[in-house]
Amino acid sequence: MSNIDNLTSRIVKDAEDKKRIILSEAEEKKSKIIAKKQEKAASEEKIIIEKAETEAVAREERIISSAELQARNEKLKSKQTVISKVFETTIEELCNASSDDFKGFVKTVILNSALAGDENLILNEQGKKMIDSDFVAELNREIGSKGNITLSDKTGNFKGGFILEKNGIEINNTFEALVSSLKDEMGLEVARVLFS
């Protein structure tokens, strides 16, 4: 019986030793797997954080760029508004010219134009109060032999200045048209003077 007890005891001891070895190896494998997974997770975490930081920087740059563009656009819009006001004020001042100044303007423009001499002079309400048939007769005398400009019965729908019309063709000398052409030519110069 003692042999059987010894044999049983040895089998149990061997089984216990094998169990310890298997558990030790399993624990070691488990630790290695966990360490690998933690290392991989840390690496992925680093990549995710770097990507998030890169995206955050790019988003911040886009927001700043958009804000700067919007500020430039607002500044440009404000400058254009000021320039438009300058030209609108110019039209208003021209419309408020004295009768003598307006007559001088009409006379100078007509005498310096290459006209056939038989055009119709179209004025707005205010212009009709300043220019009469006597002025037109004097103008025709100064034009000379081809001077046959007539004062039109038509009242122009414009702020100031005048239109010369012949056979449906108009030469637009309204203050709006003249200032508009100057705006195209002098817009940059006015901006330079105003904003430098």
Curated annotation (Swiss-Prot):
GO BP terms, alphabetized: proton motive force-driven plasma membrane ATP synthesis
Sorted UniProt keywords: ATP synthesis, Hydrogen ion transport, Ion transport, Transport
TM annotation in the entry: none
GO CC terms, sorted: proton-transporting two-sector ATPase complex, catalytic domain
InterPro entries assigned to the protein according to its UniProt record, in alphabetical order: ATPase_V1_Esu
GO molecular function, one term: ATP binding
Summary of the function given for this chain in its UniProt record: Produces ATP from ADP in the presence of a proton gradient across the membrane.
Protein name in UniProt: V-type proton ATPase subunit E
Gene: atpE
